[in-house]
Amino acid sequence: TLMHKDRLILASAFYTPKHGDIVVINRYAEEPLIKRVIAMGGDELQIDPDTHIVLLNGEELDEPYVHYDTVLEDFRGPITIPEGYVFVMGDHRNASKDSRMDEVGLINVKDIAGKAIFRIWPLNKIGGLE
């Protein structure tokens, strides 16, 4: 789990987002967002309102890193992600500002600074990210 003030190393040169990647998103007027790529261009995404299960292209998404129910927020689906965009969510689904909210929405891949690959601060949490 990443926390506010954590310091990260990014892979950014020639980076193309992939499902499950933890990415840093430039927001220009605000602090960057650090979220996980859930769906990409061409994918169909649905969140079951009763079970809170995330369905990607009709299949339940395996998310061992999520420990809270995925609440809907402003999300109304199913949606098909347009090419050149990604849908991102935080791992703390009950308290994450992410693509489920109209305020954030879909992320243009051009706004992704890179993939977070390694945490260098705080010292007691140094290590690779999954």
Regions found by a protein language model. Give the residues of each.
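Soluble "head" domains of membrane/secretory-pathway proteins
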Residues: 4-130
